[in-house]
Swiss-Prot record:
Lineage: Bacteria, Pseudomonadati, Pseudomonadota, Alphaproteobacteria, Rickettsiales
Protein name as catalogued: Methionine--tRNA ligase
Keyword Transport on entry: no
Matching NCBIfam families: metG, PRK12267.1
Principal location class: cytoplasm
Gene3D superfamilies in UniProt: 2.170.220.10, HUPs, Isoleucyl-tRNA Synthetase, Domain 1
Family per similarity comment: Belongs to the class-I aminoacyl-tRNA synthetase family. MetG type 2B subfamily.
Amino acid sequence: MNNTYYITTPIYYVNDIPHIGHAYTSVASDVIARFMRLRGFDVMFLTGTDEHGQKVEKAAINKNIDPQKFTDQTSESFRHLMTAMHISNDDFIRTTEHRHKKAVAVFWQKLLDNGTIYEGFYEGWYAVRDEAFFDESELTRDGLAPTGAPVEWVKEPSYFFNLSKWQDKLLEFYEANPDFIRPISRRNEVISFVKSGLKDLSVSRTTFNWGIKVPNNEKHVIYVWLDALANYISALGYLDEQSNYNKFWPADLHVVGKDILRFHAVYWPAFLMAAEVPLPKTIMAHGWWTNEGQKISKSLGNTIDPIKLIDEFGVDQVRYFLMREVTFGADGNFARSNLITRINSELSNKIGNLLQRTTSFVYKNNDAKVPLLTQGVIDKIYELPILKTASKFVEQNILLMDKTEINKILENIINLAEEANIYIDSEAPWNLKKTDPDKMLEVLYALLEVLRYIAIMLLPFIPSSANKMLDQLGVNKEERLFKHLIRDYTLTAGSNILEPTIIFPKFE
């Protein structure tokens, strides 16, 4: 088995500050990356910023600042988001970096040498906001791009990529690789778009300067999407024998928003085929967020600042809500009341309550120690229904993650916590203390073990809080991988637990 795993977010466009959509994509990708590390994979997790193009140049001009200084400032705000959201990326690529420009030039030359790029003249509609070209037939009745972006008529010399040549090859590839695009609804949209006919794509501009110059023809700037998509290989050191390229490419998963799926599922694989580069294995397109049922936009003044949410509720609480509230791939609605309800009813009432009740009882009634039981008794405990449920946890959740059904993993965790809360109520260790002390110890051990399973499975989602849970339980820091969720790595009988503290406070 290949033990490497390469996952990417899209690189984020730096014409504005980070918002909830950036946070959502980043957290989802981070959860997957952390999950794969816990499975024992050697993970490469990439994020970064897309810093070229007409939109960035205009934004810099409007602020009366040099484009490089502008991108330096805005790129830093995305780095700050990654730190604030506890994103565990292994690399952060900027398209203004030398390593990226060098790789793009090599990639361009490969396309040129293979006869897939030619010179011509572009005349048509272009949306600066989307950095995308559109046919007349794609415009709305109001003459806007499908995204609602205004378009302008562009006439200029251009290099073209012979996208039309790759139409049949793309359709053959989609057919042979049904898991290439997720979810299936997005896959069907892409196939329909490609079947409707592909036209050759303009891949250079001459009407602005902020971008990577075309090799040997500096009047042209490479189209921002060709430049940007190449980040996935430039960050690995494309064609550099000493780099990570041979180790990690092709990517296992590109996580993208549904608005940029066409670029990733049509243009990118066509570019790669033309450059004789293996294609990524899966592209996962997630949905958009609304705010209290309204479309989020600057004009409505209802953008959601993830940093402010973290400051108010805590990073793990925000991470949990984003992953729990929505089926990954579907659209979601941000409602403050729903965020508070998720935190209080699930993190605090179900997981936090179970942890507090169990550890407090052990701390006060068993000298702050994991019950000292024989292996025979521990084996008997593992035959309890609740431990049987926990024992199937890893296998079930790996299958769900393989299908990127992230919120269902959290549903499993909450269900197990509910089952454990029912178990503690029905067994009533506070009564057993008087009537059957040995049985009390068995019940406490079972509950502590269930909490160990829950905490390790929560590590990808709420890493800081889950590690605090494991610290309270006295779990060795070297025994917090999925491979440790078996009977061989049970809590050490007689070991100490920490004095309980509240990890999941409630909010009003």
